From Swiss-Prot:
It comes from the Eukaryota. It comes from Oryza sativa subsp. japonica (Rice). The gene is SPL11. This is E3 ubiquitin-protein ligase SPL11. Changing residue 290 to R: Loss of E3 ubiquitin ligase activity. Residues 350-363 have a biased composition (Polar residues). GO terms for molecular function: ubiquitin-protein transferase activity. Residues 650-667 have a biased composition (Low complexity). It is found in: Nucleus; Cytoplasm. Pathway: Protein modification; protein ubiquitination. ARM repeats lie at residues 398-438, 439-479, 480-520, 521-561, 562-602, 603-650. It is an enzyme of class 2 (transferase).
Length: 694
C-alpha cells in the first residue's frame, strides 16, 4: 500500500523540463498582462502614484523579448531544473507587480493616498523582489542572446537604482487629504483644500468621480457585505465633499445632453439634475430606473452590471439582496419625464432591448445611400459635391437616416472630402458630419476615424459657413468627456478662438459653445487662455449690445478657476463690470459673475480686487443675490460676503491701529518753532502756546 502511494506521488511530480516550461508561461502571462494593461492607455493610472506605476509597467514590458527567447528555447530530457529554480522567483515577482499595477488602475484613489505607507512598502517589496530575481538569472545556461541579455541587465540596473529612491506623494497632498478625512481643518480653507485634492487625485470629471465611487463600493463588497466600518464611510464622505466642490466649480460637469437645454431663443443654458433622479452608481440621469430587493432604485444597466460582476449586496446600503429580480420604478420614471418636459428637455429614452431591434433602412433607402457613397468616390468633383449635399440633407432629416448612413460606411468617405479643393464640397461634407454626429453612437465612429485634424483644417481654412459648421461639429463631439481631451490636444482651441473673434453671429455662438465644452476639461483651460480667449471674452462681456453675454459669462466662470485665467481676467480690470452684472444681470449671469469675483478675491492680488469691489459698491447687490439668486448664486454670494466682511474688519482694525499710534505720539517742538528757554515743563500744555506751522 505504501509502495503504491509512493508510486502515485512520483507519478504526480512533473519532470524538470515541464516545471521549467510552466515557469516560463507564468513569466510570459504576467508580462503580457502588464502589456495589455498598458494598451488601455497611460491615463488609466489617474492617481498619486501615476509616475511610479508607469515606470514599473514600462520596465516590465521591456522584458518582452526575454520572454520570447525563453519560449523559443528547446529543452532536452532532464534539463530545466536550474531554469525552473531561476524563473519561479521571477514569476512570483512579476505576479506581485501585476497585482500592484491592478491596484493602481482599479483601486480607490483616496484609499491609495491615505494608505501611502502601506502602498510604498508594496512598491519597495515588488521592486526588491524583481531586482533580486533578475540578479539570479543564469543567462549562459538559458542561452539568451547578447542583445536581450543587455536589455534585461538594463532593466535590472534601473530597478536597482529605483530601489534606493522611491518617491512618496508630497506631504501637502497627504496632509490635505488627512485633514478632510479627520475633519480637522480650517473651514475658511476648505475650498482651497478641496481644489488641490480634486486636481491631484484626478477627480475632475463625472467619469473619474463615478470610477472612484465604484472603487469604494468594491472595497465594501470585498468585505463580504459586512458593515463597511468607519474608514470607508469617512472616505465616502470625503468623496462626496470633492464631488460637491467639483460640481460647484463646474456646474455643467455632468452629462451635457442631460444637463443643458435650449431656451426660447435657442441659447444653451445649464440645468441641475435633482439627486433623486440620478443613479447612485453612475451619478447620471436615470433612463430606466428599477428597484432592487432592498428598496433602493438604480439605473437598470448599472445595477445589472453590478450583479453580473458577482456582487450580491446593495451598493448603497450594503444589505444582502434576497433576489436579483429588478422591479421597474414606473412612478420615478414618470416623475423624471415630467421634470424633463417642465425644463424643456427631451425625456430620456430607455435602452433598446435585444428583442426590439432598431428599425433598419428599407432596401430602397439603403440602395439610395449606397449609390450616394459611390458618387463620393467619383473623380468627378460635381458628383462628389451633389452626393455630399444630398447626404447632408438626409442626415438632417431623422435619426434613422443618421444610423443608416453611418452603418453604410459614409464617415471615412466624408472625411476624405474635408481636404477637397472645392469649398462647396468641403462645406457639404463637414455639415453632413455635423448632422451625423447628433446620434450618440456616430460620435465614437467619427472620433475613431481620426476626424479631428481634418475638421480643424476646415475650421482654419474653409469658407465661413464651413468653418462655422466645423465649430458646431466640434461642439457636438465635445459633449463626451474623453473627446474633450482629444479635440483640445489637436489644435482646435486656437482656431475656435479666431472664429469667435471674426465669425458671424452664428459662428461666434458655435465657437463659444465648443470652447465652453472644451474648457470644462482642466487641461484645455490653459490652451484657451494662451490662445487669447480672455480678452475676447471680456470684449463680449463689455459689449453694449449684450450679444453672447450668457456664453461669455459661462466661459469666464470656467476660466477663472485656472491660475492663468485668473491672472488674465484680473489684468483686464473686470471688477466694475462684474459688480454691475451681479446687480442687474440675468439670474445665470449674476451667479457666474459672483463665481468669477470669488476666484479673483481668492488669488494672489485678492486685496486689490476686494478694495476695488468695495469702491464699486458690491455689498448691496451681493446681499440681494444671497437672498434671491439661484442656489449656486446664493452660495457664491455668501462666500463673497464673508470675504468682504473679513476685509472690511481688517481695514477698520488697521485704521484704528494707525489712529491710536498717532494719538500716542506727543507734538514735537523744534528749535525753529519754540526758543529753548520757552519750552514748557508740562507736556499737556495748551496747543495755543505753540506757534502754528503752516
Amino acid at each position: 500500500m505504501a509502495g503504491d502511494r509512493a508510486e502515485e506521488e512520483e507519478g504526480e511530480a512533473p519532470p524538470p523540463e515541464a516545471r521549467a516550461a510552466a515557469a516560463v508561461e507564468r513569466v510570459a502571462a504576467a508580462v503580457e498582462a502588464v502589456a495589455a494593461g498598458a494598451g488601455a492607455g497611460a491615463g488609466e493610472y489617474r492617481n498619486a502614484y501615476r509616475r511610479q506605476l508607469l515606470a514599473l509597467s514600462r520596465r516590465i514590458r521591456l522584458l518582452g523579448p526575454f520572454v520570447e527567447e525563453l519560449r523559443e528555447r528547446r529543452r532536452g530530457e532532464g534539463e530545466g531544473e536550474e531554469e525552473e529554480r531561476a524563473l519561479a522567483p521571477l514569476a512570483d515577482a512579476l505576479e506581485a507587480a501585476l497585482a500592484l499595477l491592478r491596484l493602481g488602475r482599479e483601486g480607490s484613489r483616496i484609499s491609495l493616498v491615505l494608505e501611502r505607507d502601506s502602498v510604498m512598502k508594496k512598491f519597495q517589496g515588488v521592486i526588491l523582489q524583481l531586482e533580486q530575481a533578475l540578479c539570479d538569472i543564469p543567462y549562459n545556461e538559458l542561452d539568451i542572446s547578447d542583445e536581450v541579455r543587455e536589455q534585461v541587465e538594463l532593466v535590472h540596473a534601473q530597478l536597482k537604482r529605483a530601489k534606493e529612491r522611491i518617491d512618496m506623494p508630497d506631504d501637502e497632498f497627504y496632509n490635505d487629504l488627512l485633514s478632510v478625512y479627520d475633519k480637522n481643518y480650517d473651514p475658511s480653507a476648505e475650498l482651497a483644500i478641496l481644489g488641490r485634492l480634486s486636481e491631484k487625485l484626478h477627480l475632475m470629471t463625472i467619469t473619474d468621480l463615478t470610477q472612484e465611487s465604484l472603487a469604494l463600493h468594491e472595497m465594501v463588497a470585498s468585505g463580504g457585505g459586512q458593515d463597511p466600518g468607519e474608514h470607508i464611510e469617512r472616505m465616502s464622505m470625503l468623496l462626496k465633499k470633492i464631488k460637491d466642490f467639483v460640481q460647484t466649480q463646474n456646474p455643467d460637469m455632468g452629462p451635457p445632453m442631460a444637463s443643458r437645454v435650449l431656451d426660447s431663443n435657442g441659447d444653451s443654458r445649464p440645468i441641475t439634475i435633482p439627486d433623486e433622479f440620478r443613479c447612485p452608481i453612475s451619478l447620471e440621469l436615470m433612463k430606466d430606473p428599477v428597484i432592487v430587493s432592498t428598496g433602493q432604485t438604480y439605473e437598470r444597466a448599472c445595477i445589472e452590471k453590478w450583479i453580473a460582476s458577482g456582487h450580491h449586496t446593495c451598493p448603497t446600503t450594503q444589505q444582502k439582496m434576497s433576489t436579483s429580480a429588478l422591479t421597474p420604478n414606473y412612478v420615478l420614471r414618470s416623475l423624471i419625464s415630467q421634470w424633463c418636459e417642465t425644463n424643456g428637455m427631451e425625456p430620456p429614452k430607455r435602452s433598446t432591448q435585444p428583442n426590439k431591434p432598431t428599425p433598419a433602412c428599407s432596401s430602397s433607402e439603403r440602395a439610395n445611400i449606397d449609390a450616394l457613397l459611390s458618387k463620393l468616390c467619383s473623380p468627378d468633383t460635381e458628383e462628389q459635391r451633389s452626393a455630399a449635399a444630398e447626404l447632408r440633407l438626409l442626415a438632417k432629416r431623422n435619426a434613422n437616416n443618421r444610423i443608416c448612413i453611418a452603418e453604410a460606411g459614409a464617415i471615412p468617405l466624408l472625411l476624405s472630402l474635408l481636404s477637397s479643393s472645392d469649398l462647396r464640397t468641403q462645406e457639404h461634407a463637414v455639415t453632413a458630419l455635423l448632422n451625423l454626429s447628433i446620434h450618440e453612437d456616430n460620435k465614437a465612429s467619427i472620433i475613431s476615424s481620426g476626424a479631428v485634424p481634418s475638421i480643424v483644417h476646415v475650421l482654419k481654412n474653409g469658407s465661413m459657413e464651413a468653418r462655422e459648421n466645423a465649430a458646431a461639429t466640434l461642439f457636438s463631439l465635445s459633449v463626451i468627456d474623453e473627446y474633450k481631451v482629444t479635440i483640445g490636444g489637436m489644435g482646435a482651441i486656437p482656431a475656435l478662438v479666431v472664429l469667435l473673434g471674426e465669425g458671424s453671429q452664428r459662428g461666434k455662438k458655435d465657437a463659444a459653445a465648443a470652447l465652453f465644452n472644451l474648457c470644462i476639461y482642466q487641461g484645455n483651460k490653459g490652451r484657451a487662455i494662451r490662445a487669447g480667449l480672455v480678452p475676447l471674452i471680456m470684449g463680449l462681456v463689455t459689449n453694449p449690445t449684450g450679444a453672447l453675454m450668457d456664453e461669455a459669462m459661462a466661459i469666464l466662470s470656467i476660466l477663472s478657476s485656472h491660475p492663468e485665467g485668473k491672472a488674465a481676467i484680473g489684468a483686464a480690470e473686470p471688477v466694475p463690470v462684474l459688480v454691475e452684472m451681479i446687480g442687474s444681470g440675468t439670474p445665470r449671469n449674476r451667479e457666474n459673475a459672483a463665481a468669477v469675483m470669488l476666484h479673483l478675491c481668492s488669488g494672489e492680488h485678492h486685496l486689490v480686487h476686494l478694495a476695488r469691489a468695495q469702491e464699486c459698491g458690491i455689498m448691496v447687490p451681493l446681499r440681494e443675490l444671497a437672498l434671491n439668486g439661484t442656489d449656486r448664486g446664493k452660495r457664491k454670494a455668501v462666500q463673497l460676503l464673508e470675504r468682504m466682511s473679513r476685509f472690511l474688519v481688517q481695514q477698520q482694525e488697521e485704521q484704528e491701529s494707525q489712529s491710536q499710534a498717532s494719538a500716542q505720539v506727543p507734538p514735537q517742538a523744534t528749535p525753529e518753532q519754540v526758543p529753548e528757554n520757552d519750552i514748557p515743563e508740562q507736556l499737556d500744555s495748551p496747543a495755543s502756546q505753540y506757534p502754528m506751522v503752516v
